[in-house]
Amino acid sequence: MMKINVYSEKSGNFASDSKKKPMIIIESKKKKLETLKKEYPDAMIIDVTSHAQDEFVKFSPFYPNGGIPVPFTEGLVAVSVEGIWQGLKVFENVDIDTSLFSKRDMKNMKRTTRKYGPIRGHRKGVRGEELLGYLTARKLIYLPCYKWVLENKLQKLVTAIRVISKNKPVVLLDYNTNPDVYNPKSPLSHASLIKAYIEGNYPE
């Protein structure tokens, strides 16, 4: 397991310049590691997927960081972002599944149209009557949930990436590389949200 130190800008480990801009690149987890090392010989390569073998696995939306407020549902929390996203889906013949809010093993969490039929939308809260379209749900459910995790559960690791990225390139690996919140054709890259958060332009 890789160990990462959180470097302080006041320490001598990295002579960090607060004016330096972070150098963060998003790449596909499907690329061979040897290829990535050739393309980015000076970079630190960090896997932020659910298959990461170190503490950066906590960045995965599937990871049970715990205590995440379920949007539009006062008093209810879930253990993972993916559990909320999948749990609030409503299909033609199947409603929400709140059991996913407490699922910790990161397995078999996706609820698909192949299994449940056409999706109608995401319910706006567990007890809500309104169904949100895909992009609206992405903005009102997924984005705030993931931001909450970054701000409340992962600040130590966020700081590590921020400081390192000001001194050398950081490559974040994700299975999805779509950074466009408004592109419905591809799942949103959570690695791109980490990058955006560190660069101060997290989508709202």
Enumerate the predicted regions with their spans:
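Charged, low-complexity intrinsically disordered segments
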Residues: I4-Y7, F14-E204
